[in-house]
């Protein structure tokens, strides 16, 4: 299966550069993978589209202000983008500087703390802090929100709120689980009143989510690692939804990948650890009955995931429809609600 099979043409004008004034005001393309059909709707229609007894599974990761402007001891500028924290004082960062960083070098951070380069792997460096210093306060005080590269503007103060879900609780992500950005308290309340239940998983989205697929044969793509947790509470909520005949609706590809990782043995079980799960056409889904997601980049692993879920022909045709109808694409863009093709559950 080739990378070029997942290409589509997208005018730059359709890439959303800022959020809508209201979170739930986005459009929503409802895609039926079994029938191969779609219809235009709005995110605010969700309470009427979902059924009492359905279960929404949301990712409660919290995006860190993960981009830091730092300096070498010589005064040279270093831009750091957190990939993942290993513990309170240790983490991997993507580093950009005029000259390569080397193990043993000191990096001067906003606020005066000094980190040490411990390891280097390509453009990634592992940085450690002294025993009395932690990364989270440094990032919160001196970092900026890590907007994706296709948003061609500097992060603003408002992005600290809008590039974050209203239910974000567990710090650790460097990119938002963007399907969740559409939910405001009014929409969540309306869904609860409808009888739609909700539960949470955690998947800390890493910087690797923006890495392109470089191999022409997509099965050779090395998937990046991300830390995640599916709790016993969530496993019980999924079992209860099944027992009452409800559907399990993953809010975002991150929630979907977390659920499917925890069900790799065929049964959903509590799971804490790393995932490198890559879902592409031919793979099956053990848990996910429906998927709410944004529109994804051409030839990306996330587009491959939704093609696996709803079928390539249906999904790529739905994308062409969305382009023709002027939908807004990517992180701050519109949404899709997808049901699976036959045999994918």
Swiss-Prot record:
It catalyses: 7-aminomethyl-7-carbaguanosine(34) in tRNA + S-adenosyl-L-methionine = epoxyqueuosine(34) in tRNA + adenine + L-methionine + 2 H(+). The keyword Iron does not apply. It is an enzyme of class 2 (transferase). Signal peptide: none annotated. GO terms for biological process: queuosine biosynthetic process; tRNA wobble guanine modification. SUPFAM superfamilies: QueA-like. It comes from the Bacteria. It is found in: Cytoplasm. InterPro entries: QueA, QueA_dom1, QueA_dom2, QueA_sf. Its main location: cytoplasm. Keywords: Cytoplasm, Queuosine biosynthesis, S-adenosyl-L-methionine, Transferase. GO terms for cellular component: cytoplasm. The keyword Cytoplasm applies. Belongs to the QueA family. Monomer. Transfers and isomerizes the ribose moiety from AdoMet to the 7-aminomethyl group of 7-deazaguanine (preQ1-tRNA) to give epoxyqueuosine (oQ-tRNA). PANTHER family: S-ADENOSYLMETHIONINE:TRNA RIBOSYLTRANSFERASE-ISOMERASE (PTHR30307:SF0). This is S-adenosylmethionine:tRNA ribosyltransferase-isomerase. It comes from Acidithiobacillus ferrooxidans (strain ATCC 53993 / BNL-5-31) (Leptospirillum ferrooxidans (ATCC 53993)). The lineage of its organism: Bacteria, Pseudomonadati, Pseudomonadota, Acidithiobacillia, Acidithiobacillales.
């Amino acid at each position: 299966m080739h990378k070029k099979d997942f290409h589509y043409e997208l005018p730059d004008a359709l890439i959303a550069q800022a959020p809508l004034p209201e979170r739930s005001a986005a459009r929503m393309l409802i895609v039926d993978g079994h029938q191969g059909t779609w219809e235009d709707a709005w995110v605010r229609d969700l309470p009427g589209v979902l059924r009492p007894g359905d279960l929404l599974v949301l990712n409660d990761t919290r995006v860190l202000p993960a981009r830091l402007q730092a300096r070498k001891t010589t005064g040279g500028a270093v831009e750091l983008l957190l990939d993942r924290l290993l513990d309170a004082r240790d983490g991997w960062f993507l580093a950009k500087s005029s000259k390569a960083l080397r193990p043993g070098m000191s990096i001067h951070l906003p606020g005066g703390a000094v980190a040490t380069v411990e390891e280097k792997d390509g453009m990634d460096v592992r940085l450690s802090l002294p025993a009395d210093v932690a990364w989270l306060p440094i990032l919160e005080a001196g970092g900026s929100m890590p907007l994706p590269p296709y948003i061609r503007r500097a992060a603003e103060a408002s992005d600290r709120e809008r590039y974050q879900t209203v239910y974000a609780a567990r710090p650790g992500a460097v990119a938002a689980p963007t399907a969740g950005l559409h939910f405001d308290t009014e929409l969540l309340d309306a869904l609860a009143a409808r009888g739609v239940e909700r539960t949470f998983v955690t998947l800390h989205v890493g910087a690797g989510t923006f890495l392109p697929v470089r191999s022409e044969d997509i099965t050779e793509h090395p998937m990046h690692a991300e830390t995640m947790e599916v709790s016993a509470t969530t496993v019980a909520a999924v079992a209860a939804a099944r027992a009452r005949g409800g559907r399990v609706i993953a809010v975002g590809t991150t929630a979907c990948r977390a659920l499917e990782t925890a069900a790799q043995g065929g049964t959903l079980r509590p799971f804490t650890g790393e995932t490198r799960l890559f879902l592409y056409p031919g793979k099956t889904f053990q848990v996910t009955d429906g998927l709410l997601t944004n529109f994804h980049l051409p030839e990306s692993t996330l587009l491959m995931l939704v093609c696996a879920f709803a079928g390539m022909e249906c999904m790529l045709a739905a994308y062409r429809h969305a382009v023709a109808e002027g939908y807004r694409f990517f992180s701050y863009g519109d949404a899709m609600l997808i049901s699976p093709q036959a045999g994918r559950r």
